[in-house]
Amino acid sequence: MSLGLVGRKVGMTRIFTAEGDSIPVTVLDVSDNRVTQIKTVETDGYTAVQVAFGTRRASRVTKPLAGHLAKAGVQAGEILKEFQIDAAKAAELSNGTVVGPDLFEVGQKVDVQGVSIGKGYAGTIKRYNFASGRASHGNSRSHNVPGSIGMAQDPGRVFPGKRMTGHMGDDTVTVQNLEIARIDADRKLLLVKGAVPGAKGGKVFVTPAVKTRAVKGAK
């Protein structure tokens, strides 16, 4: 249970190390994360921190949410995200506290969650990397079909989870153990090594890695 940040995917670029190696990175804008509520065991049954990100016009905020934000003294945001954390860490925060990229450090591993780019209705070749049928030699109008999807009268049904055509993309995806290559504290940017789910401008959630990989030979 760790505090994270809400961000916006700016795009991809590359940076160079002192040795001249090129590293592909994704730029994440994590500016203006502010605490809107501290949840405790006594009041809510668990400990968590609610964070707002971005800005939203007052006319686009519902009255219950406007009252909630006014109580916290925080401007309305595009997203409200909740992070469950330890009670000791929650005690260090208060409503209106701005959380920035200094929450992380260069070289730290993080998990990034976002919504993947939607691909629409896709066939099994694009969706699951199925092989095509033969181009000729007896193949008539069955070049890109998935083939049989079931069996005979017994069991007489299609098993759940059968890979078939359908909607592709637009799923919540979490990429684990991405390394923070660089931090721009002035512009509140995180440069994360590798690719991050979603299109440019998409919202992402950055948290410390849950499953850290062991390094071979480390004592």
UniProtKB/Swiss-Prot annotation:
Keywords: Methylation, Ribonucleoprotein, Ribosomal protein, RNA-binding, rRNA-binding. GO terms for molecular function: rRNA binding; structural constituent of ribosome. It comes from the Bacteria. Methylated by PrmB. One of its GO terms (biological process) is translation. Pfam families: Ribosomal_L3. GO terms for cellular component: cytosolic large ribosomal subunit. The modification N5-methylglutamine is found at residue 153. SUPFAM superfamilies: Translation proteins. Residues 134-153 are annotated as: Disordered. PROSITE patterns: RIBOSOMAL_L3. InterPro entries: Ribosomal_uL3, Ribosomal_uL3_bac/org-type, Ribosomal_uL3_CS, Transl_B-barrel_sf. Belongs to the universal ribosomal protein uL3 family. HAMAP family: Ribosomal_uL3_B. Part of the 50S ribosomal subunit. Forms a cluster with proteins L14 and L19. One of the primary rRNA binding proteins, it binds directly near the 3'-end of the 23S rRNA, where it nucleates assembly of the 50S subunit. This is Large ribosomal subunit protein uL3. The lineage of its organism: Bacteria, Pseudomonadati, Pseudomonadota, Betaproteobacteria, Burkholderiales.
